[in-house]
C-alpha cells in the first residue's frame, strides 16, 4: 500500500465510521418519532419551538447525511450536516454537563465536539479518491479551503440559524 492508498483508506474509514454512526442516530430517531411524541417532547423540553418539526428535521438530516458521508457524495455538505447537528446539540443540551459524555443527567460535550472537528476535517481533506465525489470529478473542487469553508459556514451557520429560528432556552427554576 503506497501513501496515497493509505490516505484514501484512512479517509474512507473516517467517512464510513462517521456516516454509519450518524445514520444509526437517524434510524433510532425515525423509529422513535414514528412511535409517538417522545422525541418531539424531548426537543420541546430543550426549548425548541415546533418540536415535532425539529425532530423530523434532525432525523432526515441524519438519515440523508450519513449515507452521503459513507459514499463520499457532496462531502462538504454532508460534513456541514454533521457540524450543524452537533452545534445545535451542544448549545441546547450538552454544554452545561461538562466535558465527558458519561456525565449525567445529560451527556457532556466531548462527542459533539469530536463530530464537529471530524466534519471540519472531512470538509478540508475531502473524501479521498475512493468516493463518489472523486468518481464525479468534483472532489478537487470541493476540498481544501473551499471544502472547509462550505462545511464550516453551512454547518455552523445552519446550526445557529436553526437555533435563532426555533430555540427559546427554558427558564431555569
Predicted feature descriptions by range:
Residues 60-69:
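Hydrophobic, membrane-inserted alpha-helices
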Residues 1-31, 38, 52, 56, ...:
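Extended, low-polarity transmembrane helix blocks
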Residues 34-49:
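Cytosolic, membrane-interface loops and tails of multi-pass inner-membrane proteins
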Residues 41-44, 65, 85:
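N-terminal, well-ordered alpha-helical segments
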Amino acid at each position: 500500500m503506497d501513501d496515497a492508498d493509505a490516505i484514501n483508506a484512512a479517509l474512507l474509514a473516517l467517512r464510513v465510521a462517521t456516516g454509519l454512526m450518524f445514520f444509526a442516530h437517524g434510524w433510532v430517531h425515525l423509529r422513535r418519532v414514528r412511535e409517538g411524541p417522545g422525541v418531539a417532547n424531548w426537543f420541546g423540553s430543550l426549548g425548541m419551538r415546533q418540536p415535532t418539526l425539529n425532530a423530523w428535521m434532525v432525523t432526515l438530516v441524519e438519515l440523508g447525511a450519513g449515507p452521503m458521508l459513507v459514499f463520499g457524495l457532496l462531502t462538504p455538505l454532508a460534513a456541514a450536516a454533521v457540524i450543524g447537528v452537533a452545534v445545535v446539540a451542544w448549545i441546547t443540551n450538552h454544554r452545561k454537563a461538562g466535558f465527558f459524555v458519561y456525565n449525567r443527567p445529560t451527556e457532556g460535550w466531548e462527542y459533539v465536539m469530536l463530530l464537529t472537528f471530524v466534519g471540519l476535517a472531512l470538509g478540508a481533506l475531502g473524501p479521498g479518491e475512493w468516493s463518489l465525489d472523486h468518481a464525479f470529478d468534483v472532489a478537487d473542487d470541493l476540498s481544501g479551503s473551499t471544502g472547509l469553508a462550505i462545511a464550516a459556514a453551512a454547518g455552523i451557520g445552519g446550526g445557529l440559524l436553526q437555533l435563532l429560528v426555533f430555540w427559546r432556552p427554558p427558564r431555569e427554576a
